[in-house]
């Protein structure tokens, strides 16, 4: 699922999507995409199931400096966002979440947006590809292969945080990890992602 908390929908697009009932026809879907597209940066995909704007909901418990919940969302505590920015970590797009909590001392939490700028290497996708859609002709997609590596030429230079096209991966640099780990233990594990 694509999540772009920094993209705030407004006007007709916001009110139309709030009233929308799913499933819908392909024609209606294309009309909705046309409404949203001008509000979304050109490098970001607009696909069914995507979410825009800050996450809204309820928070419970204590949060470490970085949390992965649900599995496709990365949440940062406010002190982690401040430290990452102070240390000059690049590519951090952190959007404050609109959360309610019973705890009066709940720190502000931020959703980390990872724009899909890199690509997995075609050799690791191989058998995991699906054919293009017969209806809309959209390019093939793939299930995330168990062994994966990035296409070196697609890795954005100078960014410590980015996403992977077609996958819900947040890629962070060693520098990002070192900075966040200074704030104490977290429930996130990191795995090296090679490139070829």
For each of these PLM feature ranges, what is it?
Residues 1-196:
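Phosphate/anion-contacting hairpin/loop surfaces
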């Amino acid at each position: 699922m694509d999540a772009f908390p920094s993209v705030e929908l407004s006007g007709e697009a916001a009110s139309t999507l709030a009233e929308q009932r799913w499933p819908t026809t392909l024609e209606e879907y294309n009309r909705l995409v046309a409404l949203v597209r001008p509000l979304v940066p050109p490098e970001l995909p607009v696909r069914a199931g995507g979410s825009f704007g800050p996450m809204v909901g309820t928070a419970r418990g204590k949060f470490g400096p970085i949390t992965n919940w649900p599995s496709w969302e990365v949440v940062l505590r406010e002190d982690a966002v401040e430290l990452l920015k102070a240390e000059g970590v690049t590519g951090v797009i952190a959007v404050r979440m609109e959360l309610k909590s019973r705890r009066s001392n709940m720190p502000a939490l931020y959703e980390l947006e990872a724009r899909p700028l890199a690509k997995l290497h075609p050799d690791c996708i191989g058998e995991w590809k699906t054919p293009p859609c017969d209806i809309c002709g959209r390019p093939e997609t793939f299930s995330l292969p168990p062994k994966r590596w990035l296409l070196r030429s697609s890795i954005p230079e100078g960014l410590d945080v980015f996403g992977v096209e077609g996958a819900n991966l947040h890629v962070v640099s060693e520098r990002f990890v070192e900075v966040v780990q200074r704030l104490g233990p977290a429930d996130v594990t990191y795995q090296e992602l090679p490139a070829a």
